[in-house]
Amino acid sequence: MDDLQKLKAVMRGKRLHLFGPPGCGKGNRSKDLRALGLIHVASGIALRAKIRDDPDSELSKTARDVMESGGLVPDEIVVPIVMEHLERPECRENGFVLDGFPRTKAQADLLFSKVDLDLVLHLDVPRNFLVYGVVGGNRLACAACAAGYSDFDPPRVEGVCDHCGGKIVNRADDNTETIEKRLDSYDAETKAFLPDLEARGIVEVLPITVSDDEEIDESYLKTLRGEVYRVETEAGTRARMLNLEGMRQRLYRFLTEKFA
């Protein structure tokens, strides 16, 4: 049995939560964890699955009405649906990774009072990398399940989500002003409950940084796949790249040391 198969066996049944700001790479790390057999769970995925599989329930009807009106589904609807989704046989047997949920302390209190996690993986990225990375990286997303892609990490089939087959669209809200507001909201609403998770003793930090030896010339960006962060320097804007394969290997090494 090779190292990857051993890690898949170790990770079977594990319950993880990816914690980090917008643009930190949760989507790519979710893909890496799905490759280990974990089920990817986000609020949009759980809501659409509930509406599809149980359309006549009161929860489904309420969620569908709110979503069709363009509103935000309230916590008292979202959390029970996500918790129910986590009880599905595939999640119980294979384990799961929560991506981008919960977003608020209220959601976290409701969810984690019922769900025990093995690990909260905090993806810690410098804020300036986030702002320039998101704006400069031309991020894409699935219109159905919100799975993230970019020019440098595209779906296997152009325009089609690897996960659910939904349509891939450009994220029109990826501009500096909007990203700054989203990061402020993350700091105020989401990062604020990180100490509560740390008190449970299940948080591990995976710092994401860019070293000088990973700097590349902008002319090569179109031919290489990776996560691009634009950082203001005295010399102007430089393009720096985190190699996706390197980050995947780093994550797998971390999980092997943590659980093996």
Regions found by a protein language model. Give the residues of each.
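Glycine-rich phosphate-binding loop of ATP-dependent small-molecule kinases
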Residues: 1-260
